[in-house]
Amino acid sequence: MPRSLKKGPFVANHLLRKIEKMNGKGEKHVITTWSRASTIIPIMIGHTIAIHNGKSHLPIFINDRMIGHKLGEFVLTRNYRGHGKTDKKARR
């Protein structure tokens, strides 16, 4: 179920403070975050945010087509490598 419009999008406070501070100074550094549930809002455009995938932080450049999506949608947490070629049990 989507979030109520009267509440507005969820963005972690620490992430919002860092982005507003960098926008005020005009800087562009990689921002590290564990907040995969934060929604991408227009002030994030042009920043690179390193999002945690459970093991490491992967840098993602934010563009205008990502607005409204969650940060966690762009970093996969599972690494599927496919089934083994010589595995006879999987073929049955």
Curated annotation (Swiss-Prot):
A Pfam entry, by short name:
Ribosomal_S19
User: Under the GO molecular function aspect, what terms does this record hold?
Assistant: rRNA binding; structural constituent of ribosome
Query: Could you mention a single GO BP entry for this protein?
Result: translation
Q: What is this protein called?
A: Small ribosomal subunit protein uS19c
| Compartments (UniProt record) | Plastid, Chloroplast
| Function description | Protein S19 forms a complex with S13 that binds strongly to the 16S ribosomal RNA.
**Disulfide feature:** none
| Species annotation | Nephroselmis olivacea
Q: Which family does it belong to?
A: Belongs to the universal ribosomal protein uS19 family.
Keywords assigned: Chloroplast, Plastid, Ribonucleoprotein, Ribosomal protein, RNA-binding, rRNA-binding
Return the GO cellular component terms, semicolon-separated: chloroplast; mitochondrial small ribosomal subunit
